[in-house]
Structure formats: structure tokens, C-alpha cells
């Protein structure tokens, strides 16, 4: 939960979600606005974007935009003025204000939840207070963050049959404020076969009913639901947009921001986590590892494995991602030249050394081993055994190449 305490400082930026608060994604924003402005709005949209791409913030901002635009189309009241003349009342965007605070009566939210006690059949509204707080504070968070936020610990989240029935009930009601009734369903991957209860409603919804589904993994969404939705694909955030946001919101230097943006590869959640460990000198740790593998021998290798094993899973994964990032940049350096690399001076020098140390096939083989290691860390592998095994594999991958100290 320290991660959530750390992110409190972004609250002032993202408390009310509008398109102006979104990091990058200008092409997607324009596409969404044109859907509404040109009356081309499908009744069911599926936003698909990887973790940290901003798919959820975009969906939140879009729902606010829809209700604000529908208010503009309402007739303006004409009343008698103070002296008997006609007076036109200025329209107040009350609905947009409610939507930006996540309390609009016509915008309903659905998301994975857990039973509060044994035998419960939980629905999303049981956690609506926590949900509003979560999306105000951590709009770029993932489902793991959300489940930890509500105290799930090791419990699995789910969108239940009871929740599907509650969705059907909510959307059968008459709208209160807006022309539209909106259901924003986050992580439809957590809909099991009970999601089929929603098929008829999605296919033939009541008039002016809008479904907005937000997913990370298209392959895990029920095909029957997928086929009934218009897809909106959210790409990873552009490197420059990520760096700009880190400078403006997290007060990083431009060099720090570019380094973190490069490693996070368009995942803003990952970028925020990397800020927590910005003081970690991954480059020195990597240099020690490679020298232990190629030059110093078994004693140095065991010492290094002891060091990395004490860091904890999150730091271990970040270290592996950093090494993978440098390997990818090294390959780009070979093929594209220095001017196209988002690297600091020290990282560029290190990438050049990696190119002297390994050829492309070796770099690709190392990247595969690092990916496997990250996969096993996610599944609670023994860190000492894992990193010792990777150390041995690195030696055999590079063994046929001339040994160069990574100074």
C-alpha cells in the first residue's frame, strides 16, 4: 500500500477527469469527440489499451463529454424578466460537473469486486465510495492496484451474476439528468459466462443507452460481447508525452523523465512506479552483474545474487525491465543510429558497450531469458535460485564472444 501513499501527490491533477487531463492520446481524443459531434456514436464501445495507456481515464473523460454535449442540446428556458420582458436563462452544465466528480445519476460503473464476507453476492455499488476515491487518485492504476485498494489481499476479483442483474435493473430506469444513460464497465475480462446475461441488452439496448467497456486484454473478453461492440484501440502513450507529464506533474528533470519514459514504454503506471525507485542505480547493479558473469567468477556471482535477492519482487522486475530496455536500445543503435535513441549520455555509452559485448542474436537470447525471469518472479519463484540460473545462462550465451569488462 506504500505505492498508493506515494501517488497522493497526483490527486490535484486528476481529481476531475476531462480530456484536457489525459496524457497524450490526442488522436484518440479527436476520434471520440467526432463520434459525438457528428452523431456517429455507437451504442456499445470497447476501449482496448494495455496497462498504463490511459484507457480508463479516456473512458471517464468520454462519459463526461457525452453528458455535457447532450446538455447543450437541451432547449433553453424562456421566462418573464423582472420588467415584463422575456429573459433567456443561461444553461448550466450541471451534468458535466456531476460527471467529473463521478456522481452523475445517469453514469453507472461496473468493475471487479470481492465478497466482504463469506456468502456475500457483491455488486459494484457496494464499493462505489472506494471506486470514486480510487479513480480520483489512481486513474492509471490496474486491476491489481484496485483489488489491493479494497483490501482483497489474495482474493480474486469478479464481476458477478448479481452484478449483471443489477446492470440490467439500472439501465431499465429512466434517465435523471442527461439524454444518455451510460454504463462504464472496467475490465470485462472478469466477466465469466454470466456475462452472457448482458448480450441482449448490449445488442438491443433501451433508447439513448451507451455501453463503454474498458479492457486490457482483448483475448480474454467473451467473444459474444466482443462481437457486439465497436472497438476503440488505445496505443501506449508516446514517449515525449510521458516525459512531459513526468516533468510537469512529478517535477522530474528532463533527463530523468526521458530515462523513465523510455524504460516504461508508454505505461504511465509503470513510470510512476519507477519514480519511487529513481534513486536505485540500476546501471551500476547491471555493470556488477555482467562483470561477475564474465570476469570475476563464482564468488562475485553469489555475492551479486544475494544482493538482488534482497530487493523484493517489484525492484527485481524493474531491474530486469531496465536491462531489457538497454538491450532493445542497443539493437536500435546498431540499425538506426544515435540520433533516434531516447537515451541519456551514460545509458548511450552503456548501450555501445553492450554492442561490443554481444551481437544481435545474443542480445535477443538474453532478452528472452530476462522475460522468462520476470514471468517467474511474478509467480513467486525463489529469487536466489532464479537469478543464479539466469547468471549461468548469461555466461553460456555470451561465452563464445570475446570477454570485455563492462567498465
Give the label of every model feature segment.
Residues 3-16:
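Short, Lys/Arg-enriched N-terminal segments with co-localized hydrophobic residues
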Residues 13-193:
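Clamp-loader machinery-focused feature within the broader ASCE/P-loop NTPase space
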Residues 18-99, 207-210, 216-407:
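Charged, glycine-rich active-site and insertion segments that engage polyanionic ligands
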Residues 169, 200, 227:
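Conserved adenine-binding aromatic site and its adjacent loop/helix in ATP-hydrolyzing domains
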Residues 172, 197-207:
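Conserved catalytic/switch belt of AAA+ P-loop NTPases
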Residues 177-182, 206-212:
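Loop/turn-to-beta-strand initiation segments
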Residues 190, 204, 220:
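Residues immediately C-terminal
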Amino acid at each position: 500500500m506504500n505505492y498508493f501513499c506515494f501517488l497522493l501527490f497526483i490527486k490535484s491533477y486528476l481529481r476531475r477527469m476531462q480530456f484536457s487531463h489525459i496524457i497524450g492520446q490526442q488522436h484518440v481524443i479527436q476520434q471520440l469527440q467526432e463520434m459525438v459531434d457528428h452523431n456517429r456514436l455507437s451504442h456499445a464501445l470497447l476501449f482496448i489499451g494495455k496497462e498504463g495507456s490511459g484507457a480508463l481515464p479516456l473512458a471517464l473523460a468520454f462519459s463526461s463529454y457525452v453528458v455535457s454535449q447532450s446538455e447543450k442540446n437541451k432547449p433553453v428556458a424562456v421566462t418573464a424578466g423582472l420588467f415584463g420582458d422575456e429573459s433567456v436563462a443561461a444553461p448550466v452544465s450541471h451534468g458535466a460537473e456531476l460527471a467529473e466528480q463521478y456522481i452523475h445519476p445517469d453514469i453507472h460503473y461496473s468493475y471487479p469486486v470481492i465478497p466482504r464476507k463469506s456468502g456475500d453476492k457483491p455488486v459494484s455499488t457496494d464499493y462505489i465510495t472506494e471506486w470514486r476515491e480510487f479513480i480520483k487518485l489512481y486513474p492509471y492504476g490496474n486491476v491489481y492496484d484496485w483489488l489491493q485498494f479494497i483490501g482483497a489481499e489474495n482474493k480474486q476479483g469478479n464481476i458477478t451474476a448479481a452484478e449483471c442483474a443489477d446492470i440490467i435493473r439500472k439501465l431499465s430506469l429512466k434517465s435523471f439528468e442527461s439524454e444518455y444513460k451510460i454504463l462504464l464497465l472496467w475490465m470485462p475480462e472478469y466477466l465469466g459466462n454470466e456475462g452472457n446475461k448482458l448480450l441482449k441488452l448490449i445488442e438491443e439496448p433501451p433508447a439513448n443507452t451507451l455501453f463503454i467497456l474498458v479492457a486490457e486484454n482483448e483475448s480474454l473478453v467473451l467473444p459474444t460481447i466482443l462481437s457486439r461492440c465497436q472497438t476503440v484501440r488505445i496505443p501506449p502513450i508516446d514517449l515525449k508525452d510521458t516525459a512531459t507529464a513526468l516533468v510537469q506533474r512529478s517535477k522530474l528533470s528532463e533527463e530523468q523523465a526521458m530515462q523513465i519514459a523510455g524504460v516504461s514504454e508508454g505505461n504511465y503506471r509503470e513510470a510512476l512506479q519507477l519514480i519511487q525507485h529513481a534513486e536505485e542505480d540500476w546501471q551500476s547493479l547491471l555493470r556488477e552483474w555482467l562483470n561477475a558473469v564474465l570476469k570475476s567468477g563464482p564468488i562475485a556471482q553469489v555475492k551479486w545474487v544475494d544482493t538482488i535477492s534482497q530487493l523484493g519482487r517489484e525492484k527485481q522486475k524493474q531491474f530486469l525491465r531496465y536491462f531489457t530496455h538497454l538491450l532493445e536500445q542497443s539493437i536500435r543503435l546498431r540499425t538506426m543510429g544515435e540520433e533516434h535513441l531516447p537515451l541519456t549520455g551514460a545509458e548511450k555509452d552503456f548501450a555501445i558497450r553492450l554492442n561490443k559485448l554481444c551481437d544481435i542474436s545474443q542480445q535477443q537470447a538474453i532478452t528472452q531469458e530476462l522475460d522468462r525471469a520476470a514471468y517467474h518472479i511474478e509467480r513467486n519463484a525463489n529469487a536466489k535460485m532464479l537469478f543464479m540460473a539466469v547468471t549461468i545462462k548469461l555466461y553460456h550465451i555470451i561465452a563464445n564472444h570475446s570477454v570485455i569488462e563492462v567498465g
